[in-house]
């Protein structure tokens, strides 16, 4: 009987907001529009960072990687979410769920590490401007970006491998829009303390350590800016890092709220909190990638000029 209860699952049912079917059409339209904006905005940033020689700098190299990450991250979940809104049978295969978990976690981890690298880049640019070309040479910033991707892929491969080996005892209803790793782990009918410990270690290494690097970098940046006597100089120095700081606050604010809430929430109304988790996850998964190009371009003259001259590039010529 015990073996029978642990039958291998072939598919998962994505519950999402199926309890509110009238909202599904509204969510479909909103998420579809946001996804188009994500593709256009981040795609444009990638193009200009490649085609415009003036943007061949470490900062825009990292920004191009960040934009590519946002496109990959949203593409792992949004298309399937849109299909599920229009389909009566909201299912995903076990292998498809595993792939979605792997890609989503890999992209999320890579972005955490990459934001830390970008903070260090801004620290060197503002606090050590004369040594910036030496410290942030191509031999430095390319391995930094590659290391971010490597960390994300390895972390995701390890965690996903352990999760897919868990027994689910025919529990296949995921209370989420997509195969988010925590939502899948909740279905396991075995002790997941090992998985939770592994996730804790990964969170410290790939989320909190980059956050610590960001905090230290910006503490030194703010200290350096305050030493500048002219208000114009302070304003110019702060404008070079304000966009990145805004993105960091939105990204980390959302992710820390999601994954570091106290466990006492289980004693409260679980349905309301599940709905809250899903709404926050949607904000984290859609709003942040959509806002990143806007944040980086609104106060950036170089980006505005590059976008303005983009149609005249040889890339578009016959």
Swiss-Prot record:
- Quote the Gene3D superfamilies the UniProt record gives: Rhodopsin 7-helix transmembrane proteins
UniProt protein name: Olfactory receptor 13C9
Q: Name one Pfam family in it.
A: 7tm_4
Describe the function of this protein: Odorant receptor.
**Which cystines does this chain contain?**
97-189
**Where does the UniProt entry place glycosylation sites?**
5
Tell me a GO biological process for this protein: detection of chemical stimulus involved in sensory perception of smell
Annotated family: Belongs to the G-protein coupled receptor 1 family.
Indicate yes or no for the key word Phosphoprotein: no
Indicate how the chain sits in the lipid bilayer.
Answer: Multi-pass membrane protein
Where is the protein found, in the record's own terms? Cell membrane
Swiss-Prot/TrEMBL keywords = Cell membrane, Disulfide bond, G-protein coupled receptor, Glycoprotein, Membrane, Olfaction, Receptor, Sensory transduction, Transducer, Transmembrane, Transmembrane helix
Molecular function GO terms recorded: G protein-coupled receptor activity; olfactory receptor activity
The record places the following residue ranges in the Extracellular compartment, namely 1-25, 76-99, 161-197, 259-277
Q: Looking at the record's lineage, which domain of life comes first?
A: Eukaryota
According to the UniProt record, one GO cellular component term is: nucleoplasm
- Tell me the residue ranges located in the Cytoplasmic compartment per UniProt: 47-54, 121-139, 218-237, 299-318
The residue ranges crossing the membrane are 26-46, 55-75, 100-120, 140-160, 198-217, 238-258, 278-298
């Amino acid at each position: 009987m015990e073996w029978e209860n642990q039958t291998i699952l072939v598919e998962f049912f994505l519950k999402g907001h199926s309890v509110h079917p009238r909202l599904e059409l509204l969510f479909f339209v909103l998420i579809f529009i946001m996804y188009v904006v994500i593709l256009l905005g981040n795609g444009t940033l990638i193009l200009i960072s490649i085609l415009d020689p003036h943007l061949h700098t470490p900062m825009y190299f990292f920004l191009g990687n960040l934009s590519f990450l946002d496109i990959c991250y949203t593409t792992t979940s949004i298309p399937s979410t849109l299909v599920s809104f229009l389909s009566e049978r909201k299912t995903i295969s076990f292998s498809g769920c595993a792939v979605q978990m792997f890609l989503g976690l890999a992209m999320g981890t890579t972005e955490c590490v990459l934001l830390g690298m970008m903070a260090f880049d801004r620290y060197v640019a503002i606090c050590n401007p004369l040594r910036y070309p030496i410290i942030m040479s191509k031999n430095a910033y390319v391995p930094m970006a590659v290391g971010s991707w490597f960390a994300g892929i390895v972390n995701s491969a390890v965690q996903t491998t352990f999760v897919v080996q868990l027994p689910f005892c025919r529990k296949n209803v995921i209370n989420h829009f997509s195969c988010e790793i925590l939502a899948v782990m909740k279905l396991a009918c075995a002790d997941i303390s090992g998985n939770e410990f592994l996730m804790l270690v990964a969170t410290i290494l790939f989320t909190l350590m980059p956050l610590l690097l960001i905090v230290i970098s910006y503490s030194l940046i703010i200290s350096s800016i305050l030493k500048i006597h002219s208000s114009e100089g302070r304003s110019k120095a702060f404008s070079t890092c304000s966009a990145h700081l805004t993105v960091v606050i939105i990204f980390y604010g959302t992710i820390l709220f999601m994954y570091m809430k106290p466990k006492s929430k289980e004693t409260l109304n679980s349905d309301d909190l599940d709905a809250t988790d899903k709404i926050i996850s949607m904000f984290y998964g859609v709003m942040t990638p959509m806002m990143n190009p806007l944040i980086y371009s609104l106060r950036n003259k170089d980006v505005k000029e590059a976008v303005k001259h983009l149609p005249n590039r040889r890339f578009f010529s016959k």
